């Protein structure tokens, strides 16, 4: 996943990996099964992505790390735009526990419906966040996040896992 530049800012990068071409090259040499980009990177590096023949996943939403209130990650790219860019799947983050979770769940519902009607898999990044969340990587919260992914129709669910015991239970 290469959406961290949007989400975390430049702190996750060094002189090499700040360049999307470097990431595409690593993915190609490593025979990765997919690369995940935000819309802007996918647009600007579309020729390189297509030449690499690595399946593209477009992350449809995002937020910066500058706002410290309850997390809300809004849709920034449509399923239709992702398809035009050659996406083989789309992804969307939901912060369960945030006071804004219903907004994100509703956006996901619409994305999932449109993506599936176009035979496109949907990945849900589901992270427990918000002022009421304690122990955001506990086994119970991990299992809850996985269950929500199942219930909302995600084809793949990405969660933060603290240890394998928690993952096995989830």
Label each residue range with its predicted role.
Residues 3-170:
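Alpha/beta enzyme core
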């Amino acid at each position: 996943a290469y959406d961290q530049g949007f989400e975390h800012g430049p702190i996750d990068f060094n002189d090499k990996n700040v360049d999307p071409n470097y990431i595409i090259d690593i993915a190609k040499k490593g025979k990765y099964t997919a690369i995940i980009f935000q819309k802007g990177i996918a647009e600007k590096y579309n020729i390189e992505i297509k030449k690499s023949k690595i399946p593209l996943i477009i992350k449809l939403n995002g937020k910066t790390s500058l706002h410290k209130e309850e997390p809300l990650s809004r849709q920034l790219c449509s399923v239709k735009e992702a398809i035009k860019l050659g996406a083989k799947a789309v992804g969307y983050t939901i912060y369960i526990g945030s006071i804004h979770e219903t907004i994100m769940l509703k956006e996901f519902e619409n994305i999932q419906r449109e993506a599936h009607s176009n035979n496109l898999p949907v990945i849900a990044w589901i992270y427990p966040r918000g002022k009421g969340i304690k122990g955001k990587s506990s086994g119970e919260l991990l299992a809850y996040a996985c269950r929500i992914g199942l219930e909302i129709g995600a084809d793949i669910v990405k969660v933060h896992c603290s240890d394998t015991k928690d993952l096995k239970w989830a």
